[in-house]
Each structure stands twice: as structure tokens, then as C-alpha cells.
């Protein structure tokens, strides 16, 4: 250690004679001091997945491994390495596990991996059944709320600004998940918020026109969104206003029954207007106030 100290001081001072006299430090000592020589991120990802897929590992260790894996793939390069290392399939396999916590962890990893990451969004869509199982979990009233929330988190990040994902989602009947979640009397405010966020993400990847509006009507999406203006949760109301404002700014026109429903539900939130996004509130109010 003393030799390393002399070498460090000599280097800092630029004293060539002192550097030569001190000699080169032990590389192993440098590794110990500065953390070098440990496994790289891809190796750590493989090791974590090996624990997750090990039938003899207990649930606690699997969940710890999934937490570690998710921290690693917060890095964009590591997230893209999921495809290179062929790890999407084992991740998808955990979504069928009997343990709800493990399913939730898998969904969380998917959501984090594809967040603001076009390459990972595209890679995920290559896997047959991947999007389908996300939709099924989000829609299922048999799933625990925490698991469904994670499914909507994954859907939101997968759909956002990705045209192909939006088309596949709609083709698979994905729009059905929204009225199911928003009309569920047992749905928590957090679940509803995640569902509305996923709808917003879908709209960001879609061409908003009369054809889409007709689809939203037929699938019961539009009515369920408007009805949730009358909820008692400010955060849910704010998300609903954001979606409606998005539709309005895209030029869509509500029919008379929708405007009547909108006005009725809007009256319930008048006392909350100071706690809501002002621009969205006024944009929606203007639509029915001018009729």
C-alpha cells in the first residue's frame, strides 16, 4: 500500500525520477481498490436469469434476482442485450408462473426494458404471444391488482409512440382491456390510472380520426373514459381529462349523447378544478359549453 501511495504522489507531481523509483503498482491491488475485475453486466444478467429460472431456487431469491436484473436493464444497452442474449423467452415464461409476485416482476422488467426504447419495443413484438399475454393479464379480473397494474405499465411503455405495437394491440382486441378495467367496481385508483395511461400511450401510436373514434365507441372505451370523470379520485380525473383533451385537439367530434354525458359528469368535478390541469379542464369544458 505504501508503494502505491508513493507511485500515486509521483504521478500527480509528474516527477519521472520518483515514478521510476516507486515502480509500477500491483495490478491486483488496483483491482481490489477500484472495483475492477468483477463480472460485466451481461454476465450478471445471465446469472440473475439463471436464478429466476432455477426450479430449486426459493421465491425470495428469485425476486431478488429479478430486482437486480431490472436495475441492470435500466441501462439502455443492457435492455437491448435482452434480445442479443435471448432472454425475452425466459422472461415471458415467468408470466405464466403460479407465483403472482414473480409474474409482477416479469411484467415490471418488460415495462422498464421497453420504456423510451424503440429497439426493445420492436424486439419484444417479435415474440409470438408476448403482447397477447400482456393483454390477457391486464384484462383478467382473476389477477391480483398489483399484477394487473404492472401489466398496464408494460403495455403503456410498449405502445407509446410505436405504430406497429399500436396496430398489433388493436388487432388482438386490446382495446377491450380499457372498459373492463375502468368499469370494474373493485379496480383501485392506481389500476385505473395505469389503464388510462396505457390508453394515452395507444393514442400516441395511432392515427386519431373518425374511424378510430368509431372503434372506441363500439368497444365501449369512450363511454367508460367519460364515466370516470365522475370518480372521486383527482389523479384519475386528471388522466381522463388528458385523454379527452388529446382527442379534442386531434379534431374528433363527440355526438350529442356523448356531449350530454360529458356535461353531466363534468358538473361533478367543478369543485375540483383548482386541483386539475387547467388547460385540459378548459379544453374539455369548451366542447360542451359551445353546443
From Swiss-Prot:
Q: Which UniProt keywords apply?
A: Cytoplasm, Repeat, Translation regulation
InterPro entries under this entry?
ARM-like, ARM-type_fold, Hsp70_NEF-Inhibitors, Nucleotide_exch_fac_Fes1
**Annotated GO biological process:** cytoplasm protein quality control by the ubiquitin-proteasome system; regulation of translation
List the GO molecular function terms.
adenyl-nucleotide exchange factor activity
**Pfam families under this entry?**
Fes1
Q: What SUPFAM superfamilies does the annotation carry?
A: ARM repeat
Q: Does the keyword Cytoplasm apply?
A: yes
Localisation: Cytoplasm
Q: What cellular component terms from Gene Ontology apply here?
A: cytosol; endoplasmic reticulum
Which windows of the sequence hold ARM repeats? 13-57, 76-115, 119-160, 163-204, 210-249
Function text: Functions as a nucleotide exchange factor (NEF) for Hsp70 chaperones which accelerates the release of ADP. Required for fully efficient Hsp70-mediated folding of proteins.
Entry's family note: Belongs to the FES1 family.
Provide the protein name: Hsp70 nucleotide exchange factor FES1
Amino acid at each position: 500500500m505504501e508503494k502505491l501511495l508513493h507511485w500515486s504522489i509521483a504521478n500527480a507531481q509528474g516527477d519521472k525520477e520518483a515514478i521510476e523509483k516507486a515502480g509500477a503498482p500491483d495490478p491486483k491491488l488496483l483491482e481490489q481498490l477500484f472495483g475492477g475485475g468483477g463480472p460485466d453486466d451481461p454476465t450478471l444478467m445471465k446469472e440473475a436469469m439463471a436464478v429466476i429460472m432455477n426450479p430449486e431456487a426459493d421465491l425470495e431469491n428469485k425476486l431478488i434476482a429479478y430486482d437486480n436484473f431490472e436495475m441492470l436493464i435500466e441501462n439502455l444497452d443492457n435492455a437491448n442485450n435482452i434480445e442479443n442474449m435471448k432472454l425475452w423467452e425466459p422472461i415471458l415464461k415467468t408470466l405464466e408462473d403460479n407465483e403472482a409476485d414473480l409474474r409482477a416482476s416479469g411484467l415490471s422488467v418488460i415495462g422498464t426494458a421497453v420504456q423510451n426504447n424503440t429497439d426493445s419495443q420492436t424486439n419484444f413484438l417479435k415474440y409470438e404471444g408476448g403482447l397477447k399475454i400482456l393483454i390477457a393479464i391486464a384484462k383478467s379480473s382473476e389477477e391480483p391488482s398489483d399484477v394487473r397494474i404492472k401489466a398496464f405499465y408494460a403495455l403503456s411503455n410498449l405502445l407509446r409512440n410505436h405504430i406497429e405495437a399500436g396496430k398489433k394491440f388493436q388487432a388482438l382486441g386490446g382495446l377491450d382491456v380499457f372498459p373492463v378495467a375502468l368499469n370494474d367496481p373493485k379496480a383501485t385508483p392506481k389500476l385505473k390510472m395505469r389503464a388510462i395511461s396505457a390508453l394515452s400511450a395507444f393514442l400516441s401510436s395511432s392515427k386519431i380520426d373518425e374511424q378510430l373514434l368509431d372503434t372506441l365507441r363500439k368497444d365501449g372505451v369512450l363511454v367508460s373514459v367519460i364515466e370516470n370523470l365522475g370518480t372521486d379520485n383527482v389523479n384519475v380525473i386528471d388522466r381522463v381529462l388528458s385523454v379527452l383533451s388529446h382527442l379534442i385537439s386531434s379534431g374528433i367530434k363527440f355526438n350529442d349523447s356523448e356531449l350530454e354525458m360529458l356535461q353531466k359528469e363534468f358538473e361533478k368535478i367543478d369543485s375540483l378544478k383548482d386541483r386539475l390541469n387547467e388547460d385540459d379542464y378548459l379544453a374539455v369544458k369548451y366542447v360542451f359549453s359551445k353546443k
